[in-house]
Amino acid sequence: MPFWVILGISSLTWLAILHSLRHFKQRWDLNSLLIILLVGLLLPAVAATFNVLSSPSNRWLLLSTLLFSVLTMRLIDDWKKLDSWDYRLFLGASVGLIIIIWVVNGFTFNVSARDLISYILLFVLITWFIGSSAMHLSRLTLIIGCFTLLCLNLINTGFGATMTSSGVANPQQLYRGSATSWINKYLDGAQKALPRNDNFYRTTLTPGFYARGAASGKKNISMLLGTHDIASYFSVQNRSISQFSQSIGNQEADPNSPLSTADGRTTTRNLLGVRYIFELADRYDPKNIPVGYHALKNNDGHVRIFKDQPVAGGLSNKTGTIVFVNDNFLPLVSTQNAQISAAKYQRLNAVDKEQAMIQAPITDKPITGVKQVQPQKIATTVPYTVKVRNVTDRPVNSSSRLSQKLVTTNKKIVNDNQTTNKDGLHQLVSDCQGHQLTYDLILDHPEKWQNKELYLEVSGMTMVKPTLNQFLQNNAANAVFANRPNTTLAKIQQFRQALHTDWQLSGYYLSASTAYRSNNFSQQSPTNLSNYSIRKRVILNLGYSSHLRRIVTVRFSQVPELKIHHVKLMAVGFKGRYQRQIKAIQKHGLKQQKVTNNTITGRTQAQTASVLTTSIPYSTGWHLTVDDKPTKTQVVNTGFVGAKIPAGQHKVKLQYHTPGLRLGAIISLIGLLLLLVSILWQSHAWLHNQSNQ
């Protein structure tokens, strides 16, 4: 079940919170903090602020343990002062909690044995408090009893994760040493084929390289393997990367990983200087390799396949790895003698924005002495016709009147939806059973789109969430199709399930595929916390291919209906002018380039003033000197370091200094001095008091 936050507090802390709230005026300071905590919990902006001004994350609530600890100690201190109204509150609020749990579970108390024991221990604790007061037990006896119950609660909580029999957590555990071995063999040793010289390069994986859910770890694995993967960039490190990724409509971008694999987009890889791409061996098809790519080969001329290196526990890509070499990657630093204004750039669609950066760098602030050019629109719109697939499900008893009525309803849904989508895909719906329909976008003149990269742009998405009544109607229709009686008991069970299902379906999933490439994206629900962001426009890369692609199949799930303002197919080629532009940028790369951990040096030579263009994420920490003279930097290409370089030959040096490092060191030093003074002052006061006694 999705959740916004789970607060794991003990029964003792629960009673401490109730006790503090009852004595609100006496504990106004602690109760004020409780209220602030509750209000902050309801506001995603608070969680986002504590998560370095990024997406919401409720890790900040770990601070609440300090408050809960103080409240618990106050409860123990005030044990002798507890009266009958305190005990009534403890009992009444706990019974109310159980009633709420019963209601949200569909008026059943269908909870796990572990949860049931926790509730029993809560009432045992209340009984212990009441009994200790009635029998006038000592404070030590009370504490021993509370500590015993607390230990039992901890044992019960940890039992599910530590039990030796198969449970929820047990199958997720790996064999000892498997994780380390898997990291080292993640690319089947293909990373060893990369050059180990001083030449700078970046790498990436193809989308869907690793299918396991744990694949999100690849963002860190690349750093351990030293492959310079573009997925290792994080938004919390540098906002500029996220701005660039969102600008070009990278659908893989999320708050935690702004680039990921860049959705496999050819031009984005070139712009970021991606030299090597890791691909699964069983997906290799020479006709799907874009211009400028070639597979790494053995001495005999055959494609070099790095055999699969499985690890105990099923950690493996099951096929092996090959390496593509990209000859169109752009230099880390180059100079260009033209620029495109940000205003002209913003008028382009997301695909043409990406292509514009090949024509000339985008400058937020115009650079004097460098000519401005008009960006050319490269992407070609692909005409298509929508075909709604018929509902294939047939009732078991097709002769019944109700079955025939539902079949007729399904046909009407398909026909009406076909009419709605006659001028383009605008509405995706479900049949009367709740099954989402499938849509084929039939391409006009498919031979025109060979040897090009296809993109599907989806904009203005609005999901229609399911209702409780709709959920029950779908289940009733399924019962008719299966010729199964929909009994009262079954309806009650469906109602209970709907209480949870309605909350789960607060996001949706959309996929598009050709015969040679599939792609998808998810609109995460608000309960997804760190990965949640509203998606109103998405670009899905359907890949490059010289094959004939006739149909793009679109599917959706998790919601009964999805309304779309506009669906557009676009195609981009990489021959002719594109290749000339790539070669021109490569020719003007930084000469004698040397890259170290925080410094880049080299020489530029140009007949006119030019724009220094890099794929280094912009930060105020980067300082540029030209011929040992400080030069101001600025943002180029919506997120990277750039600057003006005068005509002629120049020595260029880019060096990174962590912003605020010196100020932070000074503040830390002042804090240490204040701490030392405070310790000395308190020590002096303690010695003075001792001497007076």
Over which residues does each language-model region extend?
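Contiguous transmembrane helix-bundle modules in multi-pass membrane proteins
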Residues: 32-45, 51-179, 656-693
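Catalytic cores of secreted or luminal carbohydrate-active enzymes
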Residues: 270-273, 286-292, 315-424, 557-577
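Extracytoplasmic/lumenal acceptor-recognition loop(s) of multi-pass membrane glycoenzymes
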Residues: 152-173, 194-266, 520, 619
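Membrane-proximal, lumen/periplasm-facing interface regions of secretory-pathway glyco-
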Residues: 114-115, 156-188, 526, 530-533, ...
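Hydrophobic, aromatic-rich transmembrane alpha-helices
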Residues: 6-31, 127-133
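Active-site-proximal, structured, solvent-exposed surfaces of multi-pass membrane proteins
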Residues: 390-693
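A cross-kingdom signal targeting lumenal/periplasmic-facing segments of multi-pass membrane
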Residues: 225-342, 364, 368-369, 374
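Hydrophobic alpha-helical transmembrane segments
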Residues: 1-11, 82-85
